[in-house]
Swiss-Prot record:
One of its GO terms (biological process) is protein folding. Keywords: Chaperone, Cytoplasm, Stress response. PANTHER family: GRPE PROTEIN, GRPE PROTEIN HOMOLOG, MITOCHONDRIAL. Homodimer. This is Protein GrpE. One of its GO terms (molecular function) is adenyl-nucleotide exchange factor activity. It is found in: Cytoplasm. GO terms for cellular component: cytoplasm. InterPro entries: GrpE (IPR000740), GrpE_coiled_coil (IPR013805), GrpE_head (IPR009012).
């Protein structure tokens, strides 16, 4: 071997050693990445399972509160069958209705109290009535109640609204 080849061989050995080290690090990083990916998949699966369990628990909590209302209704129906009197049944149903509303209010459900004027954020106009007797977009009639769950509207109030009469050709009359 001549003098020029020795540094080249040393340099090749160093390069090979560095390459081997990089390959080893690459395999370690790929293995670590594979483990992280598996851990993340497990986390997603566990999170989904936990969310489902929380939902089941919330539903169970709410439904257990409704069981006494069902029991009261069964007793009311039995009372009507037994006594053939609807007077007691009606007063019993009123009590049950109030009890149910108390449970629903405690859970955050409230009936929307409609205003006199149409509000597109709380109302759904399902009927329009042409009239000069009321201000335009006044609510003439509540067709179905609306509800809020906490502050979110879950069902708008369905209403009948007043609109100005239109002329024969479809244009508004002045």
């Amino acid at each position: 071997m001549n003098e020029n080849e020795k540094p080249q061989i040393t340099e090749q050995k160093e390069n090979q050693s560095a390459l081997d080290q990089l390959i080893k690090e690459k395999h370690e990083l790929l293995e670590h990445l594979r483990q992280l990916k598996a851990q993340f998949e497990n986390y997603k699966r566990d999170s989904l399972r936990e969310k489902e369990q929380v939902l089941k628990n919330a539903n169970e909590y709410f439904l257990v509160k409704l069981i006494p209302v069902l029991d009261d209704m069964e007793r009311a129906f039995e009372e009507v069958r037994r006594s053939k009197s609807y007077k007691n049944f009606y007063s019993g149903m009123e009590i049950i209705y109030k009890k149910l509303w108390k449970i629903l209010n405690d859970e955050g459900l409230f009936k929307i109290e409609p205003k006199e004027k149409f509000d597109p954020f709380e109302h759904e106009a399902v009927e329009r009535v042409e009239t000069d007797e009321k201000e335009e977009y006044s609510i003439l009639k509540i067709l179905e109640n609306g509800y809020k769950f906490h502050k979110k509207i879950v069902k708008p109030v369905k209403v009948q609204v007043a609109v100005r009469p239109r002329g024969e050709n479809g244009a508004k009359t002045e």
